[in-house]
């Protein structure tokens, strides 16, 4: 079996149930969106191969359940994460308030060596539904990100495919920028026979 030199990045998406984590992942990887809501049980992942700044990257994107009873997935799930997406619904204030808990949970479970410089990115999702019901302003979200060390922030819509690719490209660049200069060798053919078909933070681009 031949091998090809490429980087493998493990991306974990965290946030409350119903904020659109699965939809964002499906839109980015498969370019599809469904209105039907089906809660993720435990965790699931998809992979996507891309090229960023002349570097070949295999993104292993992990989508997690937002329900409390699944928050105890443990360090085994978080271990080896190269970057983390924190997602909230701009029309749901509680999902924004819970970002602190999700960020703390990740840092505790993943145990990054340098939490202050670990590559996070925050997505304010469902901007296609914005109207009188919007509860979290862009200014408020950016202020929270600034208070955590200038985390990049994107307003997204999985449904309309707004800023989805930009957000994933940003976090990939930051992960590559922060990773140690190690080369990972991965077999060309890896068939997970599941729904599977993506390392650290900083300014984007």
Curated annotation (Swiss-Prot):
GO CC terms, sorted: plasma membrane; vacuolar membrane
Subcellular location: Cell membrane
Similarity comment: family membership: Belongs to the small GTPase superfamily. Rab family.
Major location (coarse): membrane
Gene Ontology biological process terms, A to Z: protein transport
Membrane-topology descriptor: Lipid-anchor
Keyword terms of this UniProt record: Cell membrane, GTP-binding, Lipoprotein, Membrane, Nucleotide-binding, Prenylation, Protein transport, Transport
Species the sequence originates in: Volvox carteri
Motif Effector region mapped to chain: 37-45
PROSITE patterns referenced in this protein's UniProt entry, alphabetically: RAB
Covalent lipid adducts (S-geranylgeranyl cysteine), residues: 204-205
Pfam families: Ras (PF00071)
Example GO molecular function: GTP binding
InterPro entries: P-loop_NTPase (IPR027417), Small_GTP-bd (IPR005225), Small_GTPase (IPR001806)
Protein name: GTP-binding protein yptV5
Function description: Protein transport. Probably involved in vesicular traffic.
Binding locations of GTP: 15-22, 63-67, 125-128
Superkingdom of origin: Eukaryota
